[in-house]
Amino acid sequence: MVDYNLGCTVRLDDEETLALLARLYEDGAIRHIQVQAVPLPRRLFRERLGRIAASGIPVVVHAPHHGHGVNPCAPAAYDDRPLAVIKAYIEEAMSRTLEAADTLGAETIVLHAGRYEPGGRFTAVEAFADFLDHHNDPRLTLENLPAVYAGYPLLGNTAKELAALAGTRITRFCLDFPHLACTANYRRLSFVDELEQFEGLNVALHHLSNIRCGSITDEHLELDHPDGGLDLAAVFARLRRHAAVPATLEYKEDSANVYARQVEVFAGLWAE
């Protein structure tokens, strides 16, 4: 058994990647999976949950985010659906997320505060507080987001901002390394200094992939990507200091093929 708690991400409907991750788990190469609770028809949702539960792999659940139509801090931003439809959709999505966590025995539910329209940060902060008032679960774990993506701002980019958003409602946090690097590049901050600020938070999960050197855009690149610019020395120094905190790899394209190799890359970086 490896001396770190590494995991990989899989969508609820991605059976090919789940099969690969089950083999990696059986081999002892990973110790958990992060399940993206993407919206699915009810029957398919229950069927997929059953298959994941049957794998016996410990699970972290990732709640749907704005890419799935769930945008807590500004539900109607960048969305032309009627507001009543949006709100009903979010309620159903969060209900399914809690159901997934219950079924899979997940102790962690990763949450994004969301994106908002330029100039709307104050309103977004208030809306997110309202969201937490209506969705109060001790498993909710707030993740830091890049400062911007595709031209729109996102809420909760630094340790200080996450703490302010969480207030007393959320006590657990997810540190996403490439998101923090994108924020540091965009705001011209020191990545190492911003990383240090997370020592004051109760970080329950790490997210890891790579970004291009100097980039402000989160691309979920491989750890050994030739254009990678993430400060891996600083990242792995923190991972070793907090070896008991799970670290989840997150990739988007060709996941089944990418994860098999990236688990090995991670092991090599850890050994170094």
Positions of PLM-derived features:
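C-terminal helical cap(s) of enzyme catalytic domains, especially alpha/beta-barrels
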Residues: 256-272
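N-terminal pre-domain/capping segments
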Residues: 1-88, 92-95, 172, 272
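Gly/Pro-rich active-site loop or hairpin
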Residues: 70-91, 152-156, 179-244, 253
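Active-site acidic/histidine proton-transfer and metal-coordination neighborhood
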Residues: 72-172
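Hydrophobic faces of well-ordered beta-strands that scaffold small-molecule active sites
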Residues: 2-10, 31-35, 59-63, 109-111, ...
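Active-site beta-loop-alpha junctions enriched in small/polar residues
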Residues: 9-13, 36-40, 64-66, 114-116, ...
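Acidic (Asp/Glu)-rich catalytic clusters
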Residues: 21-28, 42-68, 95-105, 126-137, ...
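Active-site glycine- and acidic-residue-rich loops that bind
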Residues: 37-43, 115-125, 148-159, 179-192, ...
